[in-house]
Amino acid sequence: MDKVKYPVLTEKTIRLLERNQYCFDVDLKASKTEIKQWIQDFFKVKVVAMNSHRPPKKKKRIGPVLGYPVRYKRMIITLESNYSIPLFLNK
């Protein structure tokens, strides 16, 4: 599915992994129900809660041209305690 762009791995999101919360950047037009259904079907997990926010715009200069990068929505997904996403497991 092209609505889920990629997982986000920052210091904060790595701390969230301990609470069984995972962070993804998704398409701005994607709804919570679409993303929830896709996560449950693709990873075979049970989603308990979802939080979303849109990070603020930031200006980007390329030479003399000033513009804005493509907008996205960030989803923080909480799973049931007995589920995990194998993509984020450490070995």
Swiss-Prot record:
<comment type="function">
    <text>Binds to 23S rRNA.</text>
</comment>
<dbReference type="GO" id="GO:0003735">
    <property type="term" value="F:structural constituent of ribosome"/>
</dbReference>
<keyword id="KW-0694">RNA-binding</keyword>
<dbReference type="InterPro" id="IPR012677">
    <property type="entry name" value="Nucleotide-bd_a/b_plait_sf"/>
</dbReference>
<comment type="similarity">
    <text>Belongs to the universal ribosomal protein uL23 family.</text>
</comment>
<keyword id="KW-0687">Ribonucleoprotein</keyword>
<dbReference type="InterPro" id="IPR013025">
    <property type="entry name" value="Ribosomal_uL23-like"/>
</dbReference>
<keyword id="KW-0689">Ribosomal protein</keyword>
<dbReference type="GO" id="GO:0005840">
    <property type="term" value="C:ribosome"/>
</dbReference>
<dbReference type="InterPro" id="IPR012678">
    <property type="entry name" value="Ribosomal_uL23/eL15/eS24_sf"/>
</dbReference>
<dbReference type="Pfam" id="PF00276">
    <property type="entry name" value="Ribosomal_L23"/>
</dbReference>
<dbReference type="GO" id="GO:1990904">
    <property type="term" value="C:ribonucleoprotein complex"/>
</dbReference>
<dbReference type="GO" id="GO:0019843">
    <property type="term" value="F:rRNA binding"/>
</dbReference>
<dbReference type="GO" id="GO:0006412">
    <property type="term" value="P:translation"/>
</dbReference>
<keyword id="KW-0150">Chloroplast</keyword>
<keyword id="KW-0699">rRNA-binding</keyword>
<dbReference type="GO" id="GO:0009507">
    <property type="term" value="C:chloroplast"/>
</dbReference>
<protein>
    <recommendedName>
        <fullName>Large ribosomal subunit protein uL23c</fullName>
    </recommendedName>
</protein>
<comment type="subunit">
    <text>Part of the 50S ribosomal subunit.</text>
</comment>
<dbReference type="InterPro" id="IPR001014">
    <property type="entry name" value="Ribosomal_uL23_CS"/>
</dbReference>
<keyword id="KW-0934">Plastid</keyword>
